[in-house]
């Protein structure tokens, strides 16, 4: 009996020692975890807390802490990206709005400074003033649209889109402009229904931008075209003209924000230098790509490529 009591006492003593050691080790691990977490938060570090342990509860705690830290970093990065985008937008706006505001102010001063101005001249200036004011409003809207696209605030729902109808609708939208300027139009849209993963509103804006560019810059060639083609995996819409074209240097930069050199077509969208930038962002939002090829007075073509849907 005495031996059993001694064995029991020894077992309890060993158990207490083991529990003490485990508690001390856990306390040390928790203290280390707390120190590492404090360090990461104070330095805004993107690291993780790595600690080899057999303690399942502590493992779960570390996993959750690392997930929280990772999520915090993602939120911080998104905030920084949005803030940077807004700063760029405000900088570009302040620079790009000066010219139209100066023109508008000039019209106002001209009207105010001459009380005896003939009614016909006054109406002409008021018409110009109205036009420039509308352009300014459209420009501001474009800035905000681009800011939303770049900050990921603008969601573009992707659905199955009938590409034949989209192309026909948009070319018809510019029929009067094509006719009035004496253009010929080469339209190649297949009879076979073609579908793509896209967004109708985004496609309308893209095609309207590209077609208006082709009309404006293709005047020398008097010919514009729209082609819808497809293979097993992709569809492609190409808008082309035979105008003065785009130099190789400008082809590399034509999609940049506010790139408005004389040879560039980015200026065409309400004169803001945002049209092709917005076009590129919208295309990318739909999982597509946009490319440009140009030989002056032969063929300047912008091609949008999207994933085809066959089901």
Swiss-Prot record:
Mode of membrane association: Single-pass membrane protein
Catalytic activity as recorded in UniProt: ATP + protein L-histidine = ADP + protein N-phospho-L-histidine
Residue spans crossing the bilayer: 1-21
The keyword Kinase is annotated on this UniProt entry: yes
Keyword field: ATP-binding, Cell membrane, Kinase, Membrane, Nucleotide-binding, Phosphoprotein, Transferase, Transmembrane, Transmembrane helix, Two-component regulatory system
Occurrences of domain Histidine kinase (ranges): 92-310
Enzyme class: transferase
GO cellular component, one term: plasma membrane
GO terms (BP aspect): osmosensory signaling via phosphorelay pathway
Location relative to the cell: Cell membrane
Cytoplasmic compartment segments: 22-311
Domain of life: Bacteria
InterPro entries: 2-comp_sensor_kinase (IPR050351), HATPase_C_sf (IPR036890), His_kinase_dom (IPR005467), HisK_dim/P_dom (IPR003661), HisK_dim/P_sf (IPR036097), Sig_transdc_His_kin-like_C (IPR004358), YcbM-like_HATPase (IPR047963)
Residue list for modification Phosphohistidine: 95
EC number: 2.7.13.3
GO molecular function, one term: phosphorelay sensor kinase activity
Classification via SMART domains: HATPase_c (SM00387), HisKA (SM00388)
Main function: Member of the two-component regulatory system YcbM/YcbL. Probably activates YcbL by phosphorylation.
Record protein name field: Sensor histidine kinase YcbM
Organism: Bacillus subtilis (strain 168)
Taxonomic path: Bacteria, Bacillati, Bacillota, Bacilli, Bacillales
């Amino acid at each position: 009996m005495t031996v059993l009591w001694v064995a029991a006492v020894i077992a309890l003593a060993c158990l207490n020692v083991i529990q003490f050691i485990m508690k001390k080790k856990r306390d040390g691990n928790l203290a280390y975890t707390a120190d590492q977490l404090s360090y990461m938060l104070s330095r805004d570090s993107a690291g993780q807390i790595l600690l080899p342990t057999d303690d399942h509860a502590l493992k779960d705690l570390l996993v959750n802490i690392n997930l929280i830290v990772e999520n915090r970093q993602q939120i911080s990065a998104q905030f920084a990206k949005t803030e940077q985008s807004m700063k760029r937008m405000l900088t570009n706006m302040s620079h790009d709005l000066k010219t139209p505001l100066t023109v508008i102010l000039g019209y106002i001063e001209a009207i105010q400074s001459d009380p005896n101005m003939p009614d016909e001249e006054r109406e002409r200036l008021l018409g110009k003033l109205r036009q420039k004011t509308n352009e300014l409003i459209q420009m501001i809207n474009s800035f905000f649209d681009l800011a939303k696209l770049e900050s990921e605030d603008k969601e573009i729902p992707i659905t199955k889109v009938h590409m034949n109808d989209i192309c026909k609708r948009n070319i018809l939208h510019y029929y009067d402009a094509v006719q009035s300027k004496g253009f010929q139009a080469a339209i190649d849209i297949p009879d076979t229904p073609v579908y793509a993963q896209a967004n109708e509103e985004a496609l309308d804006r893209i095609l309207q931008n590209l077609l208006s560019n082709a009309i404006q810059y293709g005047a020398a060639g008097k010919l514009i075209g729209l082609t819808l083609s497809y293979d097993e995996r992709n569809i492609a819409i190409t808008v082309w003209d035979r105008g003065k074209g785009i130099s190789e240097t400008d082809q590399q930069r034509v999609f940049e924000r506010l790139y408005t050199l004389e040879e560039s077509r980015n200026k065409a969208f309400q004169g803001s230098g945002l049209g092709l930038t917005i076009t590129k962002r919208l295309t990318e939002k739909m999982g597509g790509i946009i490319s440009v090829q140009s030989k002056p007075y032969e063929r300047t073509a912008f091609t949008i490529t999207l994933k085809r849907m066959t089901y």
